[in-house]
């Protein structure tokens, strides 16, 4: 190779590097063989002088072919055992050469599994990893961007200049670069040059931590230095069937549950004051609580209320508070609005120590168009479909994942494993499943593409959901996977091996709509709507249902639960108590949204906090007390939960008394043959002599009454219970003569004796 040819070639290579158009810097930079010797070739934009430091000796480098490519001829190959001394802009510094670290980070097996869509721990390769190469500490960066012309790491390390750290393209569209000396906390992005020359700055899709919005940089973060103390909890969880357990969920949004005054900063353990993250202009003078503060306040509150789980609306990093977290850009990081990843780990750990499980809302159905996120990631429609008829939700302004692409499915499935493994969560609630299952979801005719059979089912999304649930339960057999699926798609909670989607719970949207419609009707007209109350039992055993009164029902002009109820305040409170008690005694696991537990009046506002001042008023204290006691009643009586999904667990006594709007039923469980009788009166008229058939002779203890004065009721009841009489009704020989309070739910337990005074 002639000297002039080498000079021209190096000038061209240098120009490609300076233009950020190089995809193979390892072919040029670092230690290169040359005519039986070695050339040390260092890329150092805007440097004035560069020297090589090998074993204590300094070797001057010269830029013979390009002003930013510095070279020296060496007799021996030093490997990566050298440093570079740089003089630039009057500043001198010493560093290792990034292009001397050539070992592939993504091995052949990793690349193969990722291309198949089966690398369940891909985050251990992708992203930014604090690591050691050849005895040198630094950060390994790894990114999937197969259609990019070039990719650079930009950050504080290079003044956000993409010319300094071009990445090496590997097999499968993987880009890698080890930057020696970089430390935890360093901010970075990827600068991606597309094939047509456009340049984008992107956050790391696999980043483990990101800046607080509106900043968009990713942050180098450790994922392996938290000491968990919940192994007993995890072992017990994964060795039991959650469907056989009581599940009572408090759904909430971390940023609008409670705020703190902005002039009271959070004090870190080291004594430093943390910069406050403001709540919003709608709530001036306030700031968001941190994960440590939520650990102290929220866990105590949820435990006092008696809930078994907290469900957090999405906490994956997201740029816009108004999306409630449902439009994520940082899928592998808890949002930094509230603190650090390890602080969130400590929050989960503390939940487990108090016997509370943690469920996260997970949103694999779509993602936002923000320029720093996944959209048009490498200059192509990499994560989304290119055709907007299958790749865009016009109504939401978001993009739809391309589930047919193996690497995209891998990104999502591994993300699921990541949250369970890295943050010890106990369950997920998958948002908007119907939008994934149907190609024509919210689309007019002509704006969607049928599947290969001409139908509207999204077979790619079906396969993805099946894969995600299969992998989840393979790794975490005691997990909860809850579907928010609003249609009658069959087999949502059937196992994948029989063609189901593989969830183990599904929100019962039908029950929710029927009951809210029913309770919004004037009680005097409820006799014409009895079917709303009873219909859910006709399909109750087609899926494993969870009853949910969620955030979606208290926004966008729908009013909060209390204000959905008709009548004066007394009736509103009584109706609310009756609905909650019917929910807790109806088959199915339970979820309510924050604020419902004490009768919030205003609609939920993501920029405000709850109306905690209402707890200064007795009726709201009464509703909170009712929820506390419902959770005690629920957890202490297996008849209310053990056989939720077994037809033996429920039996109507009478569901046909629409004239009085009264229903009665039994809840039973097989293990101990325990059972309860529930009687509900959904009118404001009391019934002092209402007879209900019972299966056995004996005394029936009144163990719960929503009309108790401690809940704000009129304290009408049955003096602790009623003994049965030989009076045939409802196809039973025995019955009890009850006093039914207005707008109430009563629960009775068989005591096997004629009166409470008998021994």
Swiss-Prot record:
<dbReference type="Pfam" id="PF02922">
    <property type="entry name" value="CBM_48"/>
</dbReference>
<dbReference type="InterPro" id="IPR013780">
    <property type="entry name" value="Glyco_hydro_b"/>
</dbReference>
<keyword id="KW-0119">Carbohydrate metabolism</keyword>
<feature type="active site" description="Proton donor">
    <location>
        <position position="484"/>
    </location>
</feature>
<dbReference type="GO" id="GO:0004553">
    <property type="term" value="F:hydrolase activity, hydrolyzing O-glycosyl compounds"/>
</dbReference>
<keyword id="KW-0808">Transferase</keyword>
<dbReference type="InterPro" id="IPR004193">
    <property type="entry name" value="Glyco_hydro_13_N"/>
</dbReference>
<dbReference type="InterPro" id="IPR013783">
    <property type="entry name" value="Ig-like_fold"/>
</dbReference>
<dbReference type="InterPro" id="IPR006407">
    <property type="entry name" value="GlgB"/>
</dbReference>
<dbReference type="InterPro" id="IPR014756">
    <property type="entry name" value="Ig_E-set"/>
</dbReference>
<dbReference type="GO" id="GO:0005829">
    <property type="term" value="C:cytosol"/>
</dbReference>
<comment type="pathway">
    <text>Glycan biosynthesis; glycogen biosynthesis.</text>
</comment>
<comment type="function">
    <text>Catalyzes the formation of the alpha-1,6-glucosidic linkages in glycogen by scission of a 1,4-alpha-linked oligosaccharide from growing alpha-1,4-glucan chains and the subsequent attachment of the oligosaccharide to the alpha-1,6 position.</text>
</comment>
<comment type="similarity">
    <text>Belongs to the glycosyl hydrolase 13 family. GlgB subfamily.</text>
</comment>
<keyword id="KW-0320">Glycogen biosynthesis</keyword>
<protein>
    <recommendedName>
        <fullName>1,4-alpha-glucan branching enzyme GlgB</fullName>
        <ecNumber>2.4.1.18</ecNumber>
    </recommendedName>
</protein>
<dbReference type="InterPro" id="IPR044143">
    <property type="entry name" value="GlgB_N_E_set_prok"/>
</dbReference>
<keyword id="KW-0321">Glycogen metabolism</keyword>
<dbReference type="InterPro" id="IPR037439">
    <property type="entry name" value="Branching_enzy"/>
</dbReference>
<feature type="active site" description="Nucleophile">
    <location>
        <position position="431"/>
    </location>
</feature>
<dbReference type="Pfam" id="PF00128">
    <property type="entry name" value="Alpha-amylase"/>
</dbReference>
<dbReference type="InterPro" id="IPR054169">
    <property type="entry name" value="GlgB_N"/>
</dbReference>
<dbReference type="Pfam" id="PF02806">
    <property type="entry name" value="Alpha-amylase_C"/>
</dbReference>
<keyword id="KW-0328">Glycosyltransferase</keyword>
<dbReference type="InterPro" id="IPR006047">
    <property type="entry name" value="Glyco_hydro_13_cat_dom"/>
</dbReference>
<dbReference type="GO" id="GO:0003844">
    <property type="term" value="F:1,4-alpha-glucan branching enzyme activity"/>
</dbReference>
<comment type="subunit">
    <text>Monomer.</text>
</comment>
<dbReference type="Pfam" id="PF22019">
    <property type="entry name" value="GlgB_N"/>
</dbReference>
<dbReference type="GO" id="GO:0043169">
    <property type="term" value="F:cation binding"/>
</dbReference>
<dbReference type="InterPro" id="IPR017853">
    <property type="entry name" value="Glycoside_hydrolase_SF"/>
</dbReference>
<dbReference type="GO" id="GO:0005978">
    <property type="term" value="P:glycogen biosynthetic process"/>
</dbReference>
<dbReference type="InterPro" id="IPR006048">
    <property type="entry name" value="A-amylase/branching_C"/>
</dbReference>
């Amino acid at each position: 190779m002639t000297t002039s040819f080498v000079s021209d070639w190096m000038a061209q290579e240098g120009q490609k590097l300076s233009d950020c158009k190089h995809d193979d810097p390892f072919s040029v930079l670092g230690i290169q063989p040359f005519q039986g010797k070695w050339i040390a070739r260092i890329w150092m934009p805007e440097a004035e002088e560069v020297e090589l430091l090998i074993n204590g000796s300094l070797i001057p480098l010269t830029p013979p072919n390009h002003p930013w490519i510095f070279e020296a001829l060496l007799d021996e190959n030093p490997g990566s055992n050298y440093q570079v001394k740089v003089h630039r802009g009057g500043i001198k510094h010493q560093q290792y050469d990034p292009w001397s670290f050539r070992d592939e980070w993504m091995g052949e097996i990793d690349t193969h599994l990722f291309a198949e869509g089966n690398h369940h721990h891909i985050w251990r390769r992708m992203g930014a990893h604090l690591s050691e190469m050849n005895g040198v500490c630094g950060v390994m960066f790894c990114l999937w961007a197969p259609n990019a012309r070039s990719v650079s790491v930009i950050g504080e390390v290079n003044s956000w200049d993409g010319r300094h750290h071009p990445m090496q393209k590997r097999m499968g569209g993987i880009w890698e670069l080890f930057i020696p000396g970089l430390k935890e906390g360093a901010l970075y992005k990827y600068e991606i040059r597309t094939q047509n020359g456009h340049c984008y700055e992107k956050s790391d899709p696999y980043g483990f931590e990101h800046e607080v919005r509106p900043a968009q940089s990713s942050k180098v973060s450790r994922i392996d230095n938290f000491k968990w103390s919940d192994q007993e909890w995890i072992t017990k969880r994964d060795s039991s069937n959650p469907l056989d357990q009581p599940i009572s969920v408090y759904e909430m949004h971390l940023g609008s549950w409670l705020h703190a005054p902005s002039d009271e900063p959070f004090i870190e353990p080291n004594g430093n004051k943390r910069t406050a993250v403001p709540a919003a202009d709608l709530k001036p003078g306030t700031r968001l609580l941190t994960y440590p503060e939520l650990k102290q306040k929220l866990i105590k509150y949820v435990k006092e209320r008696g809930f078994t789980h907290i469900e957090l609306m999405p906490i994956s990093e997201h740029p816009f508070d108004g999306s409630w977290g449902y439009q994520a850009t940082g899928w592998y990081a808890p949002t930094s609005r509230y603190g650090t990843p390890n602080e969130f780990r400590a929050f989960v750990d503390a939940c487990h120590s108090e016997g509370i499980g943690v469920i996260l809302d997970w949103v694999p159905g779509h993602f936002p168009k923000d320029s720093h996120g996944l959209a048009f990631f490498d200059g192509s429609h990499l994560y989304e479909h290119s055709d907007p008829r299958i790749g865009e939700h016009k109504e939401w302004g978001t993009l739809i994942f391309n589930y047919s692409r193996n690497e995209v499915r891998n990104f999502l499935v591994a993300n699921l494993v990541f949250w369970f493994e890295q943050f010890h969560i106990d369950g997920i609630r998958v948002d908007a499943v119907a939008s994934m299952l149907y190609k024509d979801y919210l689309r007019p005719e002509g704006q969607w593409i049928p599947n290969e059979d001409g139908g509207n089912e999204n077979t790619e999304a079906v396969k993805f959901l099946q894969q995600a649930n299969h992998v989840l339960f393979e790794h975490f057999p005691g997990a909860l996977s809850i579907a928010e699926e609003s249609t009658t798609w069959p087999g949502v909670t059937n196992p994948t091996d029989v063609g189901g989607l593989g969830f183990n719970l599904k929100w019962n949207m039908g029950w929710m709509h029927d009951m809210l419609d029913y309770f919004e009707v004037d009680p005097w007209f409820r006799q014409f709507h009895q079917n709303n109350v009873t219909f859910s039992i006709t399909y109750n055993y087609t899926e494993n249902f969870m009853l949910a009164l969620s955030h979606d029902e208290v926004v966008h002009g729908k009013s909060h639960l209390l204000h959905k109820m008709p009548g004066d305040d007394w009736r509103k409170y009584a109706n609310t108590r009756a609905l909650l008690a019917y929910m807790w005694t109806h088959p199915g696991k339970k979820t309510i949204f924050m604020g419902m537990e004490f009768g919030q009046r205003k609609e939920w506002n993501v920029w405000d906090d709850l109306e905690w001042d209402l707890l200064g008023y007795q009726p709201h204290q009464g509703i909170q007390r009712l929820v506390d006691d419902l959770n005690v009643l629920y957890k202490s009586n297996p008849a209310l939960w053990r056989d939720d999904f077994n037809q033996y667990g429920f039996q109507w006594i009478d569901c046909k008394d629409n004239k009085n709007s009264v229903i009665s039923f039994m809840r039973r469980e097989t293990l101990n043959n325990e059972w309860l009788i529930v009687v509900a009166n959904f009118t404001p008229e009391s019934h002092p002599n209402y007879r209900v058939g019972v299966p056995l002779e004996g005394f029936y203890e009144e163990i719960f009454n929503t009309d108790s004065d401690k809940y704000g009721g009129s304290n009408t009841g049955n003096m602790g219970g009623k003994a049965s009489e030989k009076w045939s009704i409802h196809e039973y020989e025995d019955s009890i003569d009850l006093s039914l309070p207005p707008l109430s739910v009563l629960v009775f337990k068989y005591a096997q004796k004629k009166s409470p005074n008998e021994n």
